[in-house]
Amino acid sequence: MLRKVFYISDGTAITAEVFGHAVLSQFPLEFDALTIPFVETEAKAEAVKAQINDCFITTGERPLVFHSIVKPEIRDVIYSSEGLDYDFLNTFVAPLEKQLGIAATPAMHRTHGKANEGYEARIDAINYAMENDDGQTMKHMDKADLILLGVSRCGKTPSSLYLSMQFGIKAANYPFTEDDMDNLKLPDALKRNKGKLFGLTIDPERLHEIRHSRMSNSRYSSLRQCRMEVKEVEMMYQKERIPFVNTTNHSVEEIATKILEITGLKRHMF
């Protein structure tokens, strides 16, 4: 039976999940996780406590409880459960109060709510990424923070959306297709924004697998075509001195982190 894990918050529970996943990923084990957001009252906290206690009675193992709860009275209810408690906010707040010489002033949902100035940056960036996905339009490239390039199915769209959703970065993306390969060059709109360009590439064998799952037995998905496109695009990156990374076997989170590290782009939100 898998060890039970609870991610609990009086907000979205995103913080509890992120920290919890980061900690648990250090162990070569699988877990049975349950996320419970918006535990905003003592009554809700008591109901969650009952779930935790029932799990302990059923399994004989104390559930792992990761939480980021602002209100002390709600937090105390969770503390009193039979779970093994990991309180991220309280762990860091008390030492910081001492170092900064000021008492914390907790605010509900401050880290993810609409009151956060980064909220508008997130929405604007998501809208921009969707409107400027896959070269749909070249009219607004000047407004981009970043323009991702690459062959079809190398990870441009998920990377653009992740950067916009997670960091508020306006990321457009432009595809190089089979028709471009005979005379591969940068369109004028991209030349004008050369400092914003960043290339993605991928191992041809992996690209072949991805395309084959969508359009099997086509020229588009053939290994020969994949090898040719990747080779041509990488040569263009080198000729134009466009930085690029290989996305093969990397998660979208890892790709985004590499892009930010190489480009030095600043996050617009946290």
From Swiss-Prot:
**Can you state which reaction this protein catalyses?**
[pyruvate, water dikinase] + ADP = [pyruvate, water dikinase]-phosphate + AMP + H(+); [pyruvate, water dikinase]-phosphate + phosphate + H(+) = [pyruvate, water dikinase] + diphosphate
Q: Does the keyword GTP-binding apply?
A: no
What does the entry list as the binding residues for ADP?
150-157
Primary role: Bifunctional serine/threonine kinase and phosphorylase involved in the regulation of the phosphoenolpyruvate synthase (PEPS) by catalyzing its phosphorylation/dephosphorylation.
Assigned protein family: Belongs to the pyruvate, phosphate/water dikinase regulatory protein family. PSRP subfamily.
Sorted alphabetically, which NCBIfam families does this protein's record hold? PRK05339.1 (NF003742)
- Cross-referenced HAMAP family: PSRP
Instruction: Kindly provide the name given to this protein in its UniProt entry.
Output: Putative phosphoenolpyruvate synthase regulatory protein
